[in-house]
């Protein structure tokens, strides 16, 4: 085994099989961080995780079956019961998922009975090797098939890859496939490619890796998840997919799968999240002019909304720590929502309104909004628990322009940049002469 270690074991070398593992005894498995494990006895943790994984697969299957049942059920009176079933099975499978993932965290915690950083590192490096291995293999497969030299895996995560099949679809059906064939037929074709070609190839590729590493048991497998006709990545782990089929559940209308963007973040006002999702749907099927009209119309609607609906939700902590007893009510570097909370409390006391309204306390959920200056509070922000006291007279000072920019336009501009669209019509010299 010293012969193996002396070659410098790491993920990059194992990916290219540049480490000779022929000297490794048959009853020993190597992990990418250079650790060795015996194979004559199965450890309690792998055995326990295997049982949990089987349970999760069972509940996940029931969850997906219920989702498809909901898609096919036209009777609204029956849909409620199906939705309850979906929620139950989803909660059960997610609970199992959290339990499975927590095993890695436990191995890296000094308070765990079997804490060992070598074990935790073995898990992370094995994950890196597995996902990068299949990424390379799939790129090789697609390049050999299409006689190209490019990357077809456009992104990868800890346990998944994102593969573009547009070139394959064009080769089989022609470049005008979007015009002459329904999208559902293209999705059917992609589904067959994944099930009949890619999944068996992935299984074969992982067997090759398992044999090379002399694993205890080959458990690595990949199943097709989402089939989409369009997708956008704004950054790593921040993307949108226009999904027609998710893990075998075929949607009557495409569903947006959104990861890491403001539209799914609780720090974005709920009314704004709804409009963000509407705009993303329009981006997927509309034009730049449609988007510009949508933004213009929503801006008018936005300015008519009450401050409570357009303000940022936050949890507030550190009111006492950031408060100042001098002429400045807060110290330098105070977070903006905490600054607003300090101002809110100060003026409640100054205006003797503490019997009518409660002070903001540590740990409470609040909202904050930007103010136009000058204003009675001589500051640029106000926070509040539910609504702004009418006695403050601040409603007319809410900076709707800045709120619109911060809550809606700036986050959506990132998505518009991906497709090269402008939020507003830009006049050009060429357009002037037309």
What is the predicted function of each stretch?
Residues 109-122:
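Inter-lobe coupling/hinge region of RecA-like P-loop helicase motors
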Residues 104-110, 153-162:
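Core alpha/beta catalytic barrel or barrel-like domain that forms the active/cofactor pocket
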Residues 1-33, 40, 48, 67-88, ...:
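DNA-dependent DNA polymerase catalytic subunits
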Residues 42, 104-107, 419:
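Short glycine-rich loop/turn motifs that provide flexible caps or phosphate-binding loops at active sites
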